[in-house]
């Protein structure tokens, strides 16, 4: 992938007006790039962590959030977790987009011995259910301590 293609691709996504991969293909072809197809665009979207979101006109479009990057196992947890809150029944963890499943897998691996009965993860939100034998405040503190560590 050339630097020019990467730059043009990112510039197009920053315009927040492309709702389909075929629209991105067409726009890049109009700029003179050859060999561009939907499959290549799909790989580029994944590589750069693009997400579909609503723009200011409430249209679903692809974009590259500047402040976000695709999380991986070497990312410090404190950089991926945005907020941890709870009520009497659940702990809710808000993460950067794409990080919830990675963090939920880590929490599940800690397991019942540390007071975690299970997790449910979406793209950027995790529900943590505590076991009956661990006070939720204690589990919350353990989870917050875990997020302060860098793995």
UniProtKB/Swiss-Prot annotation:
Any matching Pfam family: Arg_repressor_C
Gene Ontology cellular component annotations, sorted alphabetically: cytoplasm
Subcellular location: Cytoplasm
Keyword Nucleotide-binding: no
Pathway assigned to this chain's UniProt record: Amino-acid biosynthesis; L-arginine biosynthesis [regulation]
Species annotation: Haemophilus influenzae (strain PittGG)
Biological processes, Gene Ontology terms: L-arginine biosynthetic process; protein complex oligomerization; regulation of arginine biosynthetic process
An example Gene Ontology molecular-function term: DNA binding
Protein name: Arginine repressor
Keyword Amino-acid biosynthesis applies: yes
Gene (name only): argR
Superkingdom, natural source: Bacteria
Function: Regulates arginine biosynthesis genes.
Keyword terms: Amino-acid biosynthesis, Arginine biosynthesis, Cytoplasm, DNA-binding, Repressor, Transcription, Transcription regulation
UniProt cross-references to NCBIfam families, sorted A to Z: argR_whole, PRK05066.1
